Amino acid sequence: MSIKWEKKDGTNEGKLTFEIAPEKIKEGLNSAFNRVKKSLNVPGFRKGKVPRQIFNKMYGEEALYQEALNDLLPEAYSNAVKEADINPVDQPQIDVESMESDAAWVLTAKVTVEPEVELGQYKDLEVTKHPTRVLKADIENELNRLQQQEAELVLKEDEPAEQGDTVVIDFEGKIDGEAFDGGKGENHSLELGSGQFIPGFEDQLVGHKAGEEVAVTVTFPEDYQAKDLAGKEAVFDTKIHEVKTKELPELDDEFAKDVDEDVATLEELKAKIKDRLKDQKVAEAKAAIQEEALDIAVENATIGEIPAVMIEDDVHRQMDNFLAGMQNQGISADMYYQLTGTSADDLHKQFEEGAEKRVKTNLVLEAIVKAEKIEPSEDEINAEIKSLAEQYQMDEAAVRSALSDDMLKHDIAVRKVVDEIADSAKQTRDAKKDEE
């Protein structure tokens, strides 16, 4: 097939000229005729049994051209794109240049393609050093968290509430003396200092005892999710039923066994915590180095103007993934917007912020994959399928049928590039030394 790609200078647009060969046209016309004749009623012939020559005489072979083109175009365009070695980012605008019975059909496609990427340095980059040592303070903080988790709430008799205490309250909010939707609650447990309520609400309960009634005056934040309440002052009539304080367990062997049945002593628990924190710090350091190295690689690259459609596609992809995650938690898109007081436009704006960076990063990664000629092996593809099957609890055959080899190869190749960029990076900034 003869193809020609002409890119407009200074733009991401161009014209792709390509052909459909006569033998392919013949196959397409035969297929189109076999479909069309099934619905034809021609005098002297049973429905669907009209001969081809009679059809051509009555309607002309040209009557089959559009039907045949609809069949042939997807493959012809796809092959032309591959041969031209371009990466379209939007649906093409197809025009027919010539359609003759005994010659190749000639078509043109107005195509928007990915911007050109000129790679800069992406190996041996200098990045910040991320310490992975586990310090005594880290272990103590985790033990304190476990203590808080295992703490018991004990009633405070005739004692005022303090930060960190839990109060059980009834409340009803009013604006200008009028109650509003969502402003009332009964027997609600609230930890003071948790930030669960509007700023200022919890602070005004500190110093009060069980049985007392408190008028809590607050102002809703300007960016409050319920737009009709944003920026308004409200008074909450609040009745305190109970004040409870946390009673922390002793840090001893019994505590250790309570929080982890696989250990027998506090020292064993500390050792296990240290190992877990070490793994966590190593993983966090790896992620931070990857992110920093990628950012530098993108900065070092020269990237053409990003087509608007690429930004929009990324935003919609992020939105779809986010809402799918919500749906998996039983929250529909409409329910999410209602609960958060937002809209699809708000979510769109939220994901617009990082869209250009994400698109540029993907372009650079794909350029490196191409430059390094990275081609995942069959073993790597099989391992990826097995991993995905385990992750989503699916049959491996189902995963393979759901994902194309090209998609799997792309994901594996990009991941390998990210690892290679990070692994080659030099951690030049010394971390602050702390005692273990």
Curated annotation (Swiss-Prot):
EC category name: isomerase
Gene3D superfamilies the record matches: 3.10.50.40, Trigger factor ribosome-binding domain, Trigger factor, C-terminal domain
InterPro entries hit by this protein: PPIase_dom_sf (IPR046357), PPIase_FKBP_dom (IPR001179), Trig_fac (IPR005215), Trigger_fac_C (IPR008880), Trigger_fac_C_sf (IPR037041), Trigger_fac_ribosome-bd_bac (IPR008881), Trigger_fac_ribosome-bd_sf (IPR036611), Trigger_fact/SurA_dom_sf (IPR027304)
Catalytic activity: [protein]-peptidylproline (omega=180) = [protein]-peptidylproline (omega=0)
Residues of the signal peptide: none
Domain PPIase FKBP-type: 164-249
Subcellular location: Cytoplasm
Xref: Pfam families: FKBP_C, Trigger_C, Trigger_N
Major place of residence: cytoplasm
Molecular function in Gene Ontology: peptidyl-prolyl cis-trans isomerase activity; protein folding chaperone; ribosome binding
Protein function: Involved in protein export. Acts as a chaperone by maintaining the newly synthesized protein in an open conformation. Functions as a peptidyl-prolyl cis-trans isomerase.
Entry remark concerning the domains of this protein: Consists of 3 domains; the N-terminus binds the ribosome, the middle domain has PPIase activity, while the C-terminus has intrinsic chaperone activity on its own.
Family of this protein: Belongs to the FKBP-type PPIase family. Tig subfamily.
Name this polypeptide is given: Trigger factor
Source organism (scientific name): Ligilactobacillus salivarius (strain UCC118)
